């Protein structure tokens, strides 16, 4: 059976998988299948409600009864459908916690009360460049909902990297945060709804914002080359952020107090410290020669490409040297932090990631389930299973 979707539940204790002809739920530790249903077709989306017996399922659209416009709420103990909701267009995402159910279409977001499946609110939205809406819902009852800003085509282009923060419990907006210049690729909100993680379609920089005031508290460099981010996820207490991409690499970034003290909010305090900017400091003879050589190459008879390369070299050289004249506190702000640990899968494949204590679960679209021990540097593979 072909694997169509994979997703962890809210505390990473279970994994839900949708196949062409069935859908299943697996325990993560120890890994093993604990539920399957194959008598009503496959599933394009499967969303769990923690480890309860309720799951939300969207079909693959191979027949009218299994349309992608219908959401089924299923009791896994009785293997029975307890509620069905039908929508005007295909369902793109389903997010759920103990208070709210969020259903995302190409142009609308619907918010329901989980206790009675009553529609509470609908939000007009506009899909991004690839006809999808990026969103997430926090796992706690606070029900913080985050999604990309909508608008006309021109407005979308101008605000492609902007996130709307919405209180789905009280049904009111909280904030609008400008996160990236480029269109969004992936966003995630922490379990308690206090932190927002974002990545753009470039996939090189990952940012973390405080939801309440929109303040950027962390900025990380995932890599130098463009990648498609497939998953951003916080651990349960929001001290570590995980990031996976189609390159087959998983990165782990620290969000602890040591890093917070280096965030942009501490610039003023750090500048008042003992380390100050030098007022008089001449460059070395070697640096002077290198700058002169680069400038002369700019003025020479090179073609356009060579000039562009020289200009880039000049910019990079001056930037790297200028940082040596800045206090380390400033450099820690200007230079995005790197991961403290990473996983390199054997194949370049999209994956979803869940971090529990010092163990990381990685489920791939190729049907593999890995368990790694997370430690500084390259993580150690502990176990490998097949999702089938």
Curated annotation (Swiss-Prot):
UniProt key word RNA-binding: no
Top-level lineage group: Eukaryota
Subcellular location: Cytoplasm; Membrane; Vacuole membrane
Keyword Ligase: no
Keyword annotations of the record: Autophagy, Cytoplasm, Membrane, Protein transport, Repeat, Transport, Vacuole, WD repeat
Motif (L/FRRG motif): 220-224
Transmembrane segments: none
Membrane topology: Peripheral membrane protein
Family matches, as PANTHER family: WD-REPEAT PROTEIN INTERACTING WITH PHOSPHOINOSIDES WIPI -RELATED (PTHR11227)
Protein family according to the UniProt entry: Belongs to the WD repeat PROPPIN family.
Stated name of the protein: Autophagy-related protein 21
Source organism phylogeny: Eukaryota, Fungi, Dikarya, Ascomycota, Saccharomycotina
Gene behind this protein: ATG21
């Amino acid at each position: 059976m072909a694997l169509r979707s994979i997703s962890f539940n809210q505390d990473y204790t279970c994994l839900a998988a949708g196949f062409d002809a069935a859908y299943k739920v697996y325990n993560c530790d120890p890994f093993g299948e604990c539920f399957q249903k194959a008598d009503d077709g496959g599933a394009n989306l499967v969303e769990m409600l923690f480890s309860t017996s309720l799951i939300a399922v969207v079909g693959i659209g191979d027949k009218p009864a299994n349309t992608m416009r219908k959401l089924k709420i299923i009791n896994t103990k009785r293997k029975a459908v307890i509620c069905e909701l039908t929508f005007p267009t295909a369902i793109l995402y389903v997010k759920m916690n103990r208070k709210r159910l969020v259903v995302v279409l190409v142009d609308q977001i619907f918010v329901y009360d989980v206790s009675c499946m009553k529609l509470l609110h609908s939000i007009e939205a506009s899909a991004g460049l690839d006809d999808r809406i990026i969103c997430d819902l926090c796992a706690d009852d606070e029900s913080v909902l985050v999604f990309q800003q909508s608008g006309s085509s021109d407005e979308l282009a101008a605000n492609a990297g902007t996130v709307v923060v919405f209180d789905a419990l009280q049904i009111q907006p909280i904030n609008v945060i400008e996160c990236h210049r480029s269109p969004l690729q992936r966003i995630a909100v922490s379990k308690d709804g206090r932190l927002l993680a974002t990545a753009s379609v470039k996939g090189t920089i990952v940012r973390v914002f405080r939801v309440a005031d929109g303040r950027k508290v962390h900025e990380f460099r995932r890599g130098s080359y463009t990648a498609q981010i497939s998953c951003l996820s916080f651990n349960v207490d929001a001290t570590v952020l995980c990031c996976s991409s189609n390159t087959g690499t998983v990165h782990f970034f620290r969000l602890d107090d040591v890093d917070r003290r280096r965030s942009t909010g501490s610039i003023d305090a750090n500048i008042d410290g003992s380390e100050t900017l030098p007022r008089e400091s001449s460059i070395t003879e070697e640096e002077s020669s290198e700058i002169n050589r680069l400038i002369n190459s700019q003025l020479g008879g090179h073609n356009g490409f060579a000039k562009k390369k020289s200009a880039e070299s000049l910019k990079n050289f001056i930037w790297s040297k200028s940082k040596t004249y800045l206090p380390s506190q400033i450099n820690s702000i200007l230079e995005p932090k790197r991961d403290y640990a990473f996983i390199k899968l054997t194949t370049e494949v999209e994956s979803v990631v869940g971090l529990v204590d010092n163990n990381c679960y990685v489920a791939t679209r190729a049907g593999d389930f890995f368990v790694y021990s997370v430690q500084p540097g390259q993580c150690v593979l502990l176990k490998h299973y097949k999702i089938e």
